[in-house]
Amino acid sequence: MSEPVVDNVTNKVEKMEVKEKTSAPPKEKKEKKSNKVQLKTPKGTQDYNPRQMTIREQVFDGIKQVFKRHGAVTIETPVFELKETLTGKYGEDSKLIYDLQDQGGEICSLRYDLTVPFARYVAMNGVLNIKRYHIARVYRRDNPIMTKGRFREFYQCDFDIAGTYDLMVPDAECLVMICEILEQVKVGDFQIKLNHRKLLDAIFAICGVPADKFRAICSAVDKLDKSPWEEVRKEMVEVKALDGAVADKIEKFVSLKDEPIKLLQHLRATGMCDGNKDATEALSQLETLFGYLECFGVTQHILFDLSLARGLDYYTGIIYEAVLTGQDRVGSIAAGGRYDGLVGMYGKKDVPAVGFSIGIERIFTILEDEYKKENKKIRENATQVFVVQMEKDLIKERLAIVSELWKAGINAEFSYKVNPKLPAQLNTADESNIPLIIIIGKSEVETNSLSVKTMHDRKQVSIERSNFTVKIKEILSTIPK
């Protein structure tokens, strides 16, 4: 007897539903979210490994020697300042200042340079004269180019002379110091481009630039070291709304650059600046400065360049910028000038000042590249002696020797293993470029002596154990550095 039709259909539907259930794709497993943080430094910053830090410390030490040789003292200021302290000091570059989030207290910003904090320090503490250097980090929201030494966090090395002194004497010393520092760090041939802010303003006035456009046009001229005149002129006319004929007059001036005395004589002979009080005063000051620089013997490094503008608003006198010649890898490696009105912005009394900043990060970039090309070996530590044991069970003897070395002011290391293998100890000393090793074995213990080996020539001698540190110092003094 056949099954009822209804029952047949029901059975088929039930079977289909079962089939669909069994053939349904398995539910996707939810991927576990990773709690790992991406490890990287913020844009425009970087870590420095021991090799890099060795180079940096050597350069810093050399620069400090120059600062101290000229009688400078050092100060320290906070890494962040009240925002109002920094506002209105940097012209168009003010947009690069890092503002800190308001935490319900004072509105602060990270320092943009070391000059403005120095001026605030002088005004706040009633300082009337000081010759100071300051090496510290500064911060800028710039577009970083790490390969060219442009960062958002970087070191500056500043030197400034604040106080009322005879005309151009401190200014000349600053330029001499830049020459000494750049020769000390051995970055190659360099040139210091020099101009006078009053002369630049006089040129603008002579050419017909409206007074309210001086700073804007100055900012445009400041780009001539990176951009051709056509682009700068376009900015002046189309962006700054300067008359094209006025821009063409400016070109005749800013295209002039020559040896200091030659260009000075040319400007006077042609009468290009006649009749302008600021120009006359600036040329007189520059003549005095060039005479002092001749006495110091550094005029071969100076280029009188009327296109040099320096965009910072606080400059009032001479301005200068050092660049490397014969290569286009980095921008300026030092810059500065006179700023007689900056301190007065913070206090009742003006304190004239002049100074400069070394572009230390760019110098580091150059030196690191050169070391890589030449495959130079760099000692990452200052260890002078490595203490080695020949046989087992001499850890206490090693510790006693190292202890005496440390007490004698000698930099020393040893293996942290109780019974290290001799080849491993020698390899450590060799790879770390440690110049001297002291070897202790059972025979040395019995004879109350030590074996000493100089690594540069592989010579080995035996010395007495008693008062051995005196002999070690003698040997170290003969090793080539």
From Swiss-Prot:
The keyword Ribonucleoprotein does not apply. Residues 1-48 are annotated as: Disordered. GO terms for biological process: histidyl-tRNA aminoacylation; mitochondrial translation. Pfam families: HGTP_anticodon, tRNA-synt_His. Keywords: Aminoacyl-tRNA synthetase, ATP-binding, Cytoplasm, Ligase, Nucleotide-binding, Protein biosynthesis. GO terms for cellular component: cytosol; mitochondrion. One of its GO terms (molecular function) is ATP binding. Its EC number is 6.1.1.21. It catalyses: tRNA(His) + L-histidine + ATP = L-histidyl-tRNA(His) + AMP + diphosphate + H(+). Residues 12-31 have a biased composition (Basic and acidic residues). It is found in: Cytoplasm. InterPro entries: aa-tRNA-synth_II (IPR006195), aa-tRNA-synth_II/BPL/LPL (IPR045864), Anticodon-bd (IPR004154), Anticodon-bd_dom_sf (IPR036621), His-tRNA-ligase (IPR015807), HisRS-like_core (IPR041715), HisRS/HisZ (IPR004516), HisRS_anticodon (IPR033656). HAMAP family: His_tRNA_synth (MF_00127). Belongs to the class-II aminoacyl-tRNA synthetase family. This is Histidine--tRNA ligase, cytoplasmic.
